[in-house]
Structures are given as structure tokens and as C-alpha cells.
């Protein structure tokens, strides 16, 4: 049973560096999910392409609940994800890695919880209010930082991610407002993904890859082409970072993530 999963974002569509890869289809209360399962250092790892193969699903149409539930069904306890981001912080340059520690949610139309009371399409028919003070698992963040340090990659140990609805890029005014609010980087996929993982008491962390400066900071027109091109340039480093981080993940979970539902239902 795999205990670790990788969710690949924009530009990360294949489980390279894994061996003995097989495809599986997982049925969930929220829909069907296709994943790939392979091995790394003798351990099974699940790979899920967030946008589908070839970036076929836009951020606001991703079935986040099905994706996270599918990983849970497979027995996954820890999730490492990647996110392509625009930078609002001049110190975070294109090509840099950012080990996210905080996020802000500005999405509008997504499904944010598994716990819809009696309307839940599974036997967990209750309402839960999980603590999200620290949205990213400290153990997984530490593993990513240790890996980046060992590999000699340029990385930032902290960063606040602003999640926008998309699929369009942001306006100059939006970026100015986000900067005032304290955002370092901006993207479209961390919400509700990170919160859903917490609701199922799974550990979750994300490494953001800066692909460009955000609107009004960059003097150029923003294009998805530049995102794809930079992610292609960083592709090998991203995969090396994720695999090395897996080596640093402790076997036993000692983080608060595993007890996220304690006290969340009022019982």
C-alpha cells in the first residue's frame, strides 16, 4: 500500500524516476480518478497529474475532491505537490523554488469540503471545521527544504501563496492588492486541494516554482507559453527535488495533520 503521493501541477505530467509503473483507476464518491503507481527505492509512490495529461483540465474545473479522496482510498498519508506560480516578491525570481508555508484563498466556485452533512455522498455525514492555521505539513516542508539544500538548489524556506480562480491571469490591480495583503506568489490550484487533504488527515506540502513575475511587475504580456517553457527547463530539477524529499520523510507521522478531525466536529 503506497503511503506517499505526488500531485504534479503545470508542466509535471509524468512520474519520471519511478520504476515498475502501472496505471490504476480509482472510483470515488466524487468521480473516477486515474493515477499511476510506481516504485522509488523499493517504496510504492502514487503519481497524479492535477490537470490531466497534457494540461487538459483548467484549474477551476479540476475535481479536487475526487483526486484527494482517490489518494486516501489508496492508503496515501502524505502528499507532495508542485505549483507553477507568478511572483509578487522581487526576491523570488523566475526559476526559484518556494517551499510554501501559508496561503490565501480567493477562489469562488469550487467545492471546498468533504463534509456536507446529510448531503455528503458517503457515510461521513457530518460537518467539520478543521484547524488550518498552518496549511502545510511541517514534516513535509522540512523534507523539501532538506532536499533542496542537499541538491544545492536556490529555494526560499517560506512563502505565502494567493490562490485565484483563474483560468485568466490576474489584473495589475489584483496583484497590487495581493501584495498589500502579504502574498509572495500567486497561482490557481492550492485551494481547495490543501484543505481537502487536511480534512482527510493527510499530510500535504507544496513546492512552488516561480515561472514569471506577476501582472504589473513583469513589463511583458503574461502567457501560459512562458510558464510551460520554464517548467520544461526546471523539469529535471523538480523531479530530483521530489525524489530526494521522499528520502527525508520519516516513516512515522508526528505532525498534527494526522489528528485534524479531533475537535473539528464538536464532539
Curated annotation (Swiss-Prot):
Domain of life: Archaea
Gene3D superfamilies, alphabetized: Nucleoside phosphorylase domain (3.40.50.1580)
One annotated GO biological process: L-methionine salvage from methylthioadenosine
Subunit structure and binding partners: Homohexamer. Dimer of a homotrimer.
Disruption phenotype: Disruption of the gene results in a complete loss of ribose 1,5-bisphosphate generation from guanosine.
Role played: Purine nucleoside phosphorylase which is highly specific for 6-oxopurine nucleosides. Cleaves guanosine or inosine to respective bases and sugar-1-phosphate molecules. Involved in purine salvage.
Enzyme Commission no: 2.4.2.1
Protein known as: Probable 6-oxopurine nucleoside phosphorylase
Entry similarity comment: Belongs to the PNP/MTAP phosphorylase family. MTAP subfamily.
GO cellular component: cytosol
Functional pathway: Purine metabolism; purine nucleoside salvage
UniProt site (Important for substrate specificity): 170, 224
Alphabetical list of PROSITE patterns matching this protein: PNP_MTAP_2
Amino acid at each position: 500500500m503506497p503511503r506517499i503521493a505526488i500531485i504534479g501541477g503545470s508542466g509535471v505530467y509524468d512520474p519520471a524516476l519511478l520504476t515498475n509503473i502501472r496505471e490504476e483507476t480509482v472510483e470515488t464518491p466524487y468521480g473516477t480518478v486515474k493515477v499511476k503507481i510506481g516504485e522509488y527505492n523499493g517504496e510504492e509512490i502514487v503519481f497524479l497529474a492535477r490537470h490531466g495529461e497534457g494540461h487538459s483540465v483548467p484549474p477551476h474545473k479540476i475535481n479536487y475532491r475526487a483526486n484527494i479522496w482517490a489518494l486516501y482510498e489508496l492508503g496515501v498519508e502524505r502528499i507532495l505537490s508542485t505549483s507553477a506560480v507568478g511572483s509578487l516578491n522581487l526576491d523570488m525570481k523566475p526559476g526559484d523554488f518556494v517551499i510554501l508555508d501559508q496561503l490565501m484563498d480567493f477562489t469562488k466556485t469550487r467545492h471546498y469540503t468533504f463534509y456536507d452533512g446529510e448531503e455528503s455522498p458517503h457515510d461521513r455525514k457530518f460537518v467539520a471545521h478543521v484547524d488550518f492555521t498552518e496549511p502545510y505539513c511541517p514534516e513535509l516542508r522540512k523534507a523539501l527544504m532538506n532536499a533542496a539544500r542537499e541538491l544545492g538548489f536556490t529555494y526560499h524556506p517560506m512563502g505565502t501563496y494567493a490562490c485565484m480562480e483563474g483560468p485568466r491571469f490576474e489584473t495589475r490591480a489584483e496583484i497590487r492588492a495581493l501584495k498589500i495583503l502579504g502574498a509572495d506568489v500567486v497561482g490557481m490550484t492550492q485551494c481547495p486541494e490543501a484543505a481537502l487533504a487536511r480534512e482527510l488527515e493527510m499530510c500535504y506540502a507544496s513546492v512552488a516554482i516561480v515561472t514569471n513575475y506577476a501582472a504589473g511587475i513583469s513589463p511583458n504580456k503574461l502567457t501560459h507559453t512562458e510558464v510551460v517553457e520554464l517548467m520544461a527547463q526546471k523539469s529535471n530539477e523538480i523531479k530530483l527535488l521530489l525524489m530526494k524529499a521522499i528520502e527525508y520523510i520519516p516513516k512515522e507521522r508526528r505532525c498534527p495533520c494526522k489528528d485534524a478531525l479531533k475537535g473539528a466536529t464538536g464532539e
